Amino acid sequence: MSRNLIYRRNRALCFVLILFCFPYRFGARNTPEAEQSTAKATQIIHVSNSTWHDFSRLVDVQIGSHVSGVSELKRYLHRFGYVNDGSEIFSDVFDGPLESAISLYQENLGLPITGRLDTSTVTLMSLPRCGVSDTHMTINNDFLHTTAHYTYFNGKPKWNRDTLTYAISKTHKLDYLTSEDVKTVFRRAFSQWSSVIPVSFEEVDDFTTADLKIGFYAGDHGDGLPFDGVLGTLAHAFAPENGRLHLDAAETWIVDDDLKGSSEVAVDLESVATHEIGHLLGLGHSSQESAVMYPSLRPRTKKVDLTVDDVAGVLKLYGPNPKLRLDSLTQSEDSIKNGTVSHRFLSGNFIGYVLLVVGLILFL
């Protein structure tokens, strides 16, 4: 038997084994399981997002309707890449292009694809989120496409060196957070990614020469992506090798784990930092709600542990860290307690993890 044939046979066998060990990961998007996985999104959020229009009045609005607020919805979808209109002047008519945009939004956010403004869709649109567009991304289209939810920036840009320096701005900062607190948060966030890929991150003082530049900015800060106030877009970062990571200074950022006792509009800095570092590395948004790279994040929510989807996406770009530990891969067991999302190890599926890692390496 030829070496090439053996290789292809082993790839196929590995894929079958992964299917066997992770059957629930391979369902189509529009299934009862998918609807169950997004059930949390149907809970109307209690915190009003004053930055964006009150979309709640648009629930169940039908195509052909003329309703005040639809123009704001179109502007929102335009902001995140779903509506292409150079004039940026939108009507209040629920038309065909809007229905198509809603369907694409639902697909990208892991919702049942209906094209309708159901409660789960409208609620998700009201949540604070990352400012990076959901579209203009490259979808993973390899043999494992049916299992993957991660995306990349167009062209799949990546860094071509194994050590990246980063610096936190000493001028664009927050008065109520100490420099050391912010640095500690980012050290933890960077370590999440460096633990799974052969890239290390070195903190430096020189902001101008650092590969990755981090700072807090308010409003229009000159990069073409102005921030919009409390609980709108939380942050954004640029594809490699741009290196800029900007956080909205208008947010109430917290760096401890006292989420329950914090303000109703508090945002966990480490959760957002971990997400944005994924963008710095070249990852786009994931349609899997449990993933760190999912675009939306509820206030007072902590989500910092990389899921299998996050890890699979970044491994396809950089390959595995030689020191990658199997038990560092987390499979989400989303349990929302007191406003926090907890990600726990699946202790009962160790063999599945072994096969998954082997499969990822074979497909790299």
Swiss-Prot record:
SMART domains: ZnMc. The keyword RNA-binding does not apply. The keyword Transferase does not apply. It comes from the Eukaryota. It is an enzyme of class 3 (hydrolase). Residues 1-28 form the signal peptide. Glycans are attached at residues 49, 338. The conserved cysteine present in the cysteine-switch motif binds the catalytic zinc ion, thus inhibiting the enzyme. The dissociation of the cysteine from the zinc ion upon the activation-peptide release activates the enzyme. Belongs to the peptidase M10A family. Matrix metalloproteinases (MMPs) subfamily. This is Metalloendoproteinase 1-MMP.
